[in-house]
A protein has these predicted regions:
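Non-catalytic signal-transmission and effector/linker regions of two-component phosphorelay proteins
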Residues: 1-14, 117-137
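Active-site residues of response regulator receiver
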Residues: 63
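Conserved sequence signature across two-component system core domains
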Residues: 18-19, 42, 60
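Alpha4 helix (beta4-alpha4-beta5 surface) of REC/receiver domains from two-component response regulators
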Residues: 73, 94-111, 121
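Receiver (REC) domain active-site loop signature in two-component systems and cognate sites
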Residues: 66
Length: 137
């Protein structure tokens, strides 16, 4: 599958990027803006949850270690309200057991630094799991 096919899926979706590091947040937002209709950002888990409650983004990309509300707690809070919410963790932590634990929670995993290839490999199953009305067909 190439980037054009992925763009067909993503071009009408809105996403939320949660990252406390300003440089990483802005660079990831810029990358995603080529693929998605809307890319909102949050500086921490609490800011993200407040935004998500108002907008219910199609996909949430989140770091794990953040002030006020961690990425783990954010995932838990969102999944309490919307168990099928598409979530992607963005982390430099590469431990296989850790990644498997996230997978069992219906959370996808993207390793920092984020590459276009890695992003596309995660987006394909994430987009396929979205309800049909959100798949951009």
């Amino acid at each position: 599958m190439d980037i054009h096919e992925v763009c067909r899926w993503t071009s009408e979706l809105n996403v939320l990027v949660v990252e406390d590091d300003e440089v990483l947040r802005e660079s990831f937002q810029q990358l995603l803006s080529y693929l998605f209709a809307e890319v909102d950002t949050a500086v921490d888990g609490q800011d993200a949850f407040d935004q998500w409650v108002k907008k219910q983004h199609d996909i949430v990309f989140t770091d794990l270690n953040m002030p006020r509300l961690s990425g783990f707690r954010l995932i838990e809070k969102i999944h309490q309200q919307a168990p099928q919410q598409a979530m992607v963790v963005i982390s430099a932590y590469e431990d296989e057991i850790f990644q498997q634990a996230l997978t069992t929670q219906q959370v996808n995993y993207l390793i920092k630094p984020v590459s276009l290839e890695g992003l596309l490999n995660v987006l394909i199953p994430v987009c396929q799991s979205l309800p049909l009305e959100h798949q951009g067909y």
